[in-house]
Amino acid sequence: MLAWVIIVSIITAGLSVALVGMNATKAQGNAAASALESVARQPEAGDQINRMLLFALAFIETIMIFTLTVALILLFANPLLGKL
């Protein structure tokens, strides 16, 4: 049973970081592309668009950091191993 918990934890950590990483990268690319398009349409609003883009990128990156934190907890301080 202990081996299965370790194997599933490793697979879960790897898949979660990979999937969230791919989606976060795609979301950041879409946000940057939309911001560039918005600045091209309204150059006078560039400062406000840039500020909002930075907030959006920070929120997207926060999701990735939380996922990485959970994956590292699963790998190195797995709470499921103490219950077995």
Curated annotation (Swiss-Prot):
PROSITE patterns: ATPASE_C. Keywords: ATP synthesis, Cell inner membrane, Cell membrane, CF(0), Hydrogen ion transport, Ion transport, Lipid-binding, Membrane, Transmembrane, Transmembrane helix, Transport. The record marks 61 as: Reversibly protonated during proton transport. The keyword Transport applies. HAMAP family: ATP_synth_c_bact (MF_01396). Belongs to the ATPase C chain family. F(1)F(0) ATP synthase produces ATP from ADP in the presence of a proton or sodium gradient. F-type ATPases consist of two structural domains, F(1) containing the extramembraneous catalytic core and F(0) containing the membrane proton channel, linked together by a central stalk and a peripheral stalk. During catalysis, ATP synthesis in the catalytic domain of F(1) is coupled via a rotary mechanism of the central stalk subunits to proton translocation. Key component of the F(0) channel; it plays a direct role in translocation across the membrane. A homomeric c-ring of between 10-14 subunits forms the central stalk rotor element with the F(1) delta and epsilon subunits. This is ATP synthase subunit c.
